[in-house]
Amino acid sequence: MAKIWDERNEWQTMLDVEIAACEANAELGRIPKEAVEVIKAKADFDVERIHEIDREINHDIIAFLSAVGEYVGDEAKYIHMGMTSTDVKDTALNVQIKQASDVLIADLEKLAEVLKRRAVEFKYTPTIGRTHGVHAEPTTFGLKILLWYSETLRNIERMKRAASEMAVGKLSGAVGTYADIDPYVEEYVCKKMGLTPEIVATQVGQRDHHAEYITTLGVIAGTLAQIALEVRHLQRTEVREAEEYFSPKQKGSSAMPHKRNPVKSERICGMARLVQGYALPAFENIPLWHERDISHSSVERVMIPDATTALDYILAQTTDLVDKLLVYPEKMLEDLNMTGGLIYSPRVLLALVSKGAYRDTAYRWVQRNAMKRWLEGEDFYENLCKDEDVRKYLSEEEIKECFDYKPMLIHVDKIFARFGL
């Protein structure tokens, strides 16, 4: 990713656009073919020289063209014919975004493979599901990971759509009318650069493309933050059902030698906020004055390289996190039983209803016994067995049958089968 956003690659991509435009103009007879051969043979640039000229004239694209012209000589007069600065800048930028997107898609595919493997590994590992942070009903740890896998598959498709949205080029002149350039030049350059022509433009391609792209990066970052946040919760000392890999020589605190902190997960959550934060300036870049102002440019020079680079990094970090995640099934089972069977209250309720009890009334019977467990530590199962209202409908054996997590997980295979697993 660093190579894609390297300044040398940026200018080289712009030079590739300029040379392709010269080739197209030569086919149209606007440039001598011999001149194009000279341009292709001699065209080069020195980054420091571009900066030197830019400091004097305060226009980076003209500085670039001047620096290239010093290498090419007289034939440089044919470079940039009929084009405006954004013709080359926008088209080259979208080539770089295409390259960055390929990296991000590959990252996502690696993450998906790791998630799939670990989901299958813990397919039948029972754990407690939590809603509002409170014990709810049993699930499996494999289902948790399968959820992340499913979301990652969607993110791969989102990323492909976003990359396609950005794979457009624009060489239509100062206000998008092709006043001084033939539309064929745009078609030729875009085909050569792996893009399609923007169907209508002003001086720039419209920034709704970029807003959709950056928003997609933010959605993907949200998935990664969700994975990392779950690990952070599960690694809390009083939970410790799973935790980040901790290397033998790793240290968790400068003051507390005992510490094993979820630093990678915290880093992922933090950097996800950074990626998501770029959605706002991307939205604000959409409205530009008339046929174009330059307010979007300074934002994009920071936003796009930074967002793609940050996402590339946290995708790699998340893949490593999941791949090496330490999982403790025994602690998961211990925590599942922590509430003394309160998590089976839905099964007791349904058993009562199936025997003819009115639902709201049965709910109150089960709830009053559950509250005794919550508030006074009394045995939930024994209290149910002693409850006269409950016993009118359920035998002690029928109540006992409710206290089993296995029937609550009988459809795990069916859910996995939806993914061919």
Language model regions located:
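Generic, well-ordered alpha-helical scaffold segments in large soluble proteins
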Residues: 24, 67, 71, 114, ...
